[in-house]
Every structure is written in structure tokens, then in C-alpha cells.
Amino acid sequence: MSKEIKAQVVVLGSGPAGYSAAFRCADLGLETVLVERYSTLGGVCLNVGCIPSKALLHVSKVIEEAKAMADHGVVFGEPQTDINKIRIWKEKVVNQLTGGLSGMAKMRNVTVVNGYGKFTGPNSILVEGEGESTVVNFDNAIVAAGSRPIKLPFIPHEDPRIWDSTDALELKEVPEKLLIMGGGIIGLEMGTVYHSLGSKVEVVEMFDQVIPAADKDIVKVYTKRIKDKFKLMLETKVTAVEAKEDGIYVSMEGKKAPAEAERYDAVLVAIGRVPNGKLIDGEKAGLEIDERGFINVDKQMRTNVPHIFAIGDIVGQPMLAHKGVHEGHVAAEVISGKKHYFDPKVIPSIAYTEPEVAWVGKTEKEAKAEGIKYEVATFPWAASGRAIASDCSDGMTKLIFDKETHRVIGGAIVGTNGGELLGEIGLAIEMGCDAEDIALTIHAHPTLHESVGLAAEVFEGSITDLPNKKAVKKK
């Protein structure tokens, strides 16, 4: 059975980028069709990414905090974990959000077509669903087809003990010994969860630090905290993976490589993602797609085909939901006739580990590479009353300032709820604030948030909560 429909705008993919674009198009009065290959809206982020991982990380945090309270006179019994109930909780969270999206689509009169969509021409997409196909003829299209985990040819990915991030989030079992390939955000978040649930976690990373995009001083605080939780094998890479009846055997080479192949009960491959650009038959619409699968766009998210736009993971790094949402808004606004552009000064990045590692704007390594003259100011949480009282005093807040203008150009926070504290720094960079603007803003006390203001005071030389290196010297 097949049918044919017409729309002013068709959006291919319903992840955060796609549904945001579709809903904004509808709000701007455009007849909109949203194509999604799965039965629920929300894409990777809501279904098998950002949201379920945060639900599991919440469970992990409660377990670890309960254990830590023993040092403060409150002793709980050994936690009894029921992974079936944890899984049900995670799915409840996901269902609440995906159900909310379906409701908002109906409220906005967005037509949702389920099935695998591919271009058949510059103004048509064929959607193959279960039992029926739909041809969507469109005036404008927005490609938001996302990305998928990278698979390496020497790894037997068909073995159920070799996981990608989706498999890890299913929480089918808690392996006794888990290897995580890749010391990036996804791998470390999953390592945090499985360690709390009882797995012995090992992480192999080819670079000399985990979370390679972040500055070393920030990551150092994180690695110091987890040294007794994870075994880190830095400057080491996997060379072979063999699936045997009694486990997965992994051979490695490098600085921390074991001499012999190590046996693991499960291996999580978390070495990045690849865009889905080559899976949508874009060439039939005249789209230019590079060899990796990325679609090139301009600042209005327009492809080489003027009436086709692309947003989200499929247009390039960083592959982050919040970046895709803003790109989706821009594409919708442009299609409606507005002169909007995607030109952010900053895009925040956060590892929702414990402690969290969050940064925004320029890192030190980026500032150095660009030849920017800069100065760093840090405020250690060891001097924060709230951090000490909350038993998280190993954190740090860092600001990076342009040495000539004193404007803040970057910042990072490592510590409990660091991602929640990052917003002020991002806004300060977008608004062109200098150190004085931040330092003279009264921050509530005692809070972790005030560490941002105190770091600015360190730069300004007005700090009174630490020894002041810029104090006027008495003659």
C-alpha cells in the first residue's frame, strides 16, 4: 500500500534538531511533515542517548553518595540493586518525554510519517514503513538524519557481549569485568554507571588523557577522583578483539598495554560516531555529501541545493543535541523568510560524570593554537564553604581572559553539578563581558555558583577568599 502527500516542509529525522525544526516551522505557519524511522520521536538523544544515560547516572550518583555518607556518621546497608526496576525507571523517563513530543506534534498539526526516508529527487522523499510506503513531495526539506556509532572492521560487533552506547543503555546485565574502548564522554558516563552497579571497569584511550578536548588541568582533577574506580590505560590502543566462549579477549599496544590479551565479560566500543549522510540517497536530490557522510552547509544551514537544509550531527562537529536544536531553529526561520544565521560564539560541552567536567568557549590549547594572548584565573573549591560543606571540595572553576581586553573568552568547571554552573560563563562570553562585569555581579553565598565570580576576582586582583597575588605590595 502506498500514498502520496504534499508539504511545504519535510524534516527527515526527529532527534532534537529535527523535532525542533519541525515544531518551529509549524509555529511559523508552514505545513510540515516529520519523518522518523522509529516508532517514537526524539532520536538518539531521547531514546538511546542523553536522556536514558542521565536517568542511569542519577541512580549511580545516589548509590555513591549513600556510600560516602558513612564518613559523616550516616551508614546505609549495602545497596541492593534490581536492574529490572532500574531499567523500568529509565524507560519511564524516556516514555514521558517521547510521549510529550508526540503530543506537541499533534497540537501543532505536524504530520508524523514513520518509516525509513530516502530522497528520490530534489523535491520528493520516499518513506518505507511497515506495510506501507509514503511519497512526500515538498517545497523545502531539512535533513536531520543524525549519526550512528563507529564500528571497527577488526571487532566482531555481532557478538552480544560487544556493545555500542545503545547496548550499554539497555542495561541487560552488569558484567563482572567491563572494558571501555575510548576515554571520551560517552564511555566515561557509561563507566560511571556500571562501576556503581558493581562492574570492574577498565578504560583504554589512545591519547595521553581522557576527555581529550578538555584542558589537562581540568581533566587532572577528574582523573584524581576516579583513580580508585577505573583502571585507565592511556596512550594505549586496541589491536585485536577475539570472542571466545568464556569471554572477549582484547589485545593492546602502547604505554599501559597488558603483556597478554586480557579477558573481559563485555566490551563497550565508544570511539565516536559517524554521520548518516550516505544512508539517505542524497545524491538523487543533488546534495553534496563528503566521503565521511557529512553534508556541508552555510550559516543559514542551507546545502548546495537552495531549498534543502541540513542540521545536527550530519553537518559536523560538535555532535551535540543543543547545537542541533539551534541549527533547527535557524533553518526554520530562514525557510519562513527571516534573515537568521547560525553564528554562536560558544557551544558548551559537558561530561556528566562524577565529578562533572564542563567547558565552554576557548580552551587553553585552542587559545595557544590561535595565538591569543590570554590569562587564566582559577578558584579552587577547597576554598568554597559550600563545596566543603557538601563534601565536593576537590572541584575547580577556571576562567580564561583575553589579556588585552580582559574579556572572558573561555571557562571550565570540574566538580559536582559543574554542567549546571556553566551557563553564566557561556552567557558572559556571548555578551562580551569582561572580568570586572563578572566580579562586580553579586553572587549568592554560600553557593558553588559563586566560584565563577570569585575566579573573576582572582583575575581582577580583588579576591579576599584566597591569598591575593595581585595585592599592592607595601613599601
Swiss-Prot record:
It holds the Pfam family Pyr_redox_2. This is Dihydrolipoyl dehydrogenase. One of its GO terms (molecular function) is flavin adenine dinucleotide binding. The lineage of its organism: Bacteria, Pseudomonadati, Pseudomonadota, Gammaproteobacteria, Vibrionales. It catalyses: N(6)-[(R)-dihydrolipoyl]-L-lysyl-[protein] + NAD(+) = N(6)-[(R)-lipoyl]-L-lysyl-[protein] + NADH + H(+). Its cofactor is FAD. It comes from Vibrio parahaemolyticus serotype O3:K6 (strain RIMD 2210633). The active site is at 445 (proton acceptor). Binds 1 FAD per subunit.
